[in-house]
C-alpha cells in the first residue's frame, strides 16, 4: 500500500533533475525485533530542493503509513511540503494531513503560497475536515487551508491518489513559476527552516509511534539524523 505514491514522487523528483542521496543502512530499511513492522526511507536532493524525504511504514493489515517532506533551498521562501497518510486496517479508517507548511504566518505570504490548497479541498469534501484542526497549532507551521481527511476505504481507493497528485503537482507548479522572494531573505529562510525542524522534533506525533514499534534508542537517532536534521543547529 502507498507504493504508488512513492513511485509518483520518485518520477517527479527525477523530472526535477533530482538524485537519491545515500543514507545509513539502519534507516534505509529497518525491522522491529519480531519483524511485524518494516520501515523504509528514501532521501533525495535536486537543484531546487535541498532535501526531499519519503518514509513508508509497513505494518501489514494492521497499519500502513506514508510520509513525505520537501524542503526548498535556503534561497527560496516557499513553504515546506508536508504529507502524513495513515491507514488503520482493523478499523478501516484513513487519516491524511496534507499542507504547504508556511515559514511565517503573514497573511499575504499565506495567500501567495498556500491559498490554492482551498481549490483542491473543494473538489474532495471528505478531505475538508475542519473538526480536526484543533489538533494542530494553526499559529505555527500549518496553513489555514491544511487538508485533513478522516475517511474510510472508499476515500482510500477512490480519492487519495487523485488528491495527492493534485497536491504535489500544484506545489511544483508554484515553485516552477519562480516566485520572487517578498517576505524573507536567505538568512531568515534558513532560520525558519531550522525552527521548523526544532518545532517538529518536539511536536511530531509519529515519535510515539516509532518508539512503540522500533524502540527509543533507534527512534531518537532516526528523528535526529534523518527526519529533522536541522534540530541540532544553533540559531544565532
Curated annotation (Swiss-Prot):
Keywords, ordered alphabetically: Oxidoreductase
Claim: Oxidoreductase is one of the keywords in the record: yes
List the molecular function annotations (GO) for this entry. Answer: 15,16-dihydrobiliverdin:ferredoxin oxidoreductase activity; cobalt ion binding
Give one GO biological process term. phytochromobilin biosynthetic process
Q: Catalysed reaction(s)?
A: 15,16-dihydrobiliverdin + oxidized 2[4Fe-4S]-[ferredoxin] = biliverdin IXalpha + reduced 2[4Fe-4S]-[ferredoxin] + 2 H(+)
Query: What EC number(s) does this enzyme carry?
Result: 1.3.7.2
Q: So which domain of life are we looking at?
A: Bacteria
Q: What is stated as this protein's family in its record? A: Belongs to the HY2 family.
State the protein's purpose.
Catalyzes the two-electron reduction of biliverdin IX-alpha at the C15 methine bridge.
Q: Could you identify this protein by its name?
A: 15,16-dihydrobiliverdin:ferredoxin oxidoreductase
- Species source reads Prochlorococcus marinus (strain MIT 9215)
Q: Which gene encodes it?
A: pebA
Amino acid at each position: 500500500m502507498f507504493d504508488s505514491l512513492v513511485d509518483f514522487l520518485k518520477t517527479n523528483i527525477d523530472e526535477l533533475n533530482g538524485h537519491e542521496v545515500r543514507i545509513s543502512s539502519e534507516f534505509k530499511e529497518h525491522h522491529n525485533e519480531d519483524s511485524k513492522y518494516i520501515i523504509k526511507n528514501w532521501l533525495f536532493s535536486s537543484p531546487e530542493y535541498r532535501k526531499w524525504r519519503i518514509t513508508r511504514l509497513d505494518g501489514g493489515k494492521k497499519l500502513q503509513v506514508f510520509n513525505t517532506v520537501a524542503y526548498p533551498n535556503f534561497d527560496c521562501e516557499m513553504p515546506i511540503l508536508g504529507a502524513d497518510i495513515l491507514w488503520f486496517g482493523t478499523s478501516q479508517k484513513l487519516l491524511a494531513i496534507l499542507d504547504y507548511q508556511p515559514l511565517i504566518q503573514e497573511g499575504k505570504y499565506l495567500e501567495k503560497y498556500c491559498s490554492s490548497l482551498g481549490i483542491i479541498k473543494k473538489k474532495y469534501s471528505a478531505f475538508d475536515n475542519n473538526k480536526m484542526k484543533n489538533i494542530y497549532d494553526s499559529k505555527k507551521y500549518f496553513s489555514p487551508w491544511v487538508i485533513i481527511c478522516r475517511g474510510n476505504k472508499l476515500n482510500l481507493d477512490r480519492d487519495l491518489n487523485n488528491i495527492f497528485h493534485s497536491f504535489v503537482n500544484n506545489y511544483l507548479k508554484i515553485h516552477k513559476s519562480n516566485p520572487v522572494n517578498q517576505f524573507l531573505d536567505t538568512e531568515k529562510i534558513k532560520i525558519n527552516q531550522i525552527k521548523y525542524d526544532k518545532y517538529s522534533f518536539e511536536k511530531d506525533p509519529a515519535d510515539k509511534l516509532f518508539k512503540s514499534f522500533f524502540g527509543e534508542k533507534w527512534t531518537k537517532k532516526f528523528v535526529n539524523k534523518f527526519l529533522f536534521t536541522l534540530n541540532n543547529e544553533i540559531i544565532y
